[in-house]
Amino acid sequence: MTEQFDVVVIGAGPAGLSAALNLVRARRKVLVLDSNRPRNAATFASHGFVTRDGISPLELRRLGREELEAYEGATFAKAVVSAIEPGFVVTAGASYQASAVVIATGLTEKFPALPSLRTFYGTSIHSCVECDAYEYADAPIALIGETDDLAERALLISQWSRDLIVFTNAVGRITADEETRLAERGVSVDRRAVADVAGDRDGLSGIVLADGDVIPRSAAFVRPMYSTNLGYAASLGLATTAEGWLEIDDSGRTSVPGVYAAGDSTAPGPQQLIVAAGAGARVASAVNRDLLA
């Protein structure tokens, strides 16, 4: 027999947990389904979350789940969602019937193919500038990426350190005008191919170029390519932006009535944890009101 819920929340990051907490406090019967594979699992400390500055993302998730499960009406299950059928039958091993669905599954990062990058990711190599740049104020920093928005990201990083070199890996695009503007901030551009990153147990020490040069750097930001994890929702025909993010209105409603989204799978993509949590709370309010209609 298919178990019935008011709302099924898919994903237990800050967006999903915040949505679920606010919904269960609205006396909704809520099921949270999560694969327990957060993309920021390698990160030791997250920042900018008021009252939780410096907490690890995994600990933040643990505390959020603990708070949620203290409420009657909340159910948490470790499971991978394989399908959402019309009528909101959610399949994740078992099948669950919902009156509304909140998608908060985040995204997947694809990094430049550097053999040692993962060794330092989460310690001295990061992807979120606002989350981690403060710890490297005035330090020699690298920005590594293969996208067309490197100049914009470099300008942002230069607020924390102007000892910054942008490595395009012979792929990323920076125009002459952008390079001039970066130079005005003391930022240089290296267009050579990158072979790897170097370091030891103390952290990153340099960027290894394909021609053999090693450029000393003590920290780096990497610009990943992002993809949403939405194959399970394909049958719903949800509208997406040109970049692949779910289209939502100001309250988190998708193009399909009864389906909502919050967090990194929505435009403009990955943001700070506290922003995702706020989006989850906003969506919860919309879901609760819509279920009364």
Model-derived features: positions:
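Beta1-alpha1 glycine-rich phosphate/pyrophosphate-binding loop at the start
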Residues: 5-62, 139-140, 149-172
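A Rossmann-like FAD-binding core segment of flavoenzymes
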Residues: 62, 68-91, 95-98, 161-245, ...
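FAD-site-proximal beta/loop scaffold in flavoenzymes
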Residues: 113, 119-135, 224-276, 282, ...
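FAD-binding core/adjacent interface of flavoenzyme oxidoreductases
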Residues: 1-8, 75-139, 220, 246-254, ...
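Residue-level detector of alpha-helix initiation sites
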Residues: 13-14, 109, 148-149, 266-267
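Active-site glycine-rich loop that binds ribose-phosphate moieties when present
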Residues: 123-130, 142-153, 175-176
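Internal hydrophobic alpha-helix adjacent to the cofactor/substrate pocket in enzyme cavities
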Residues: 24-28, 162-168, 276-293
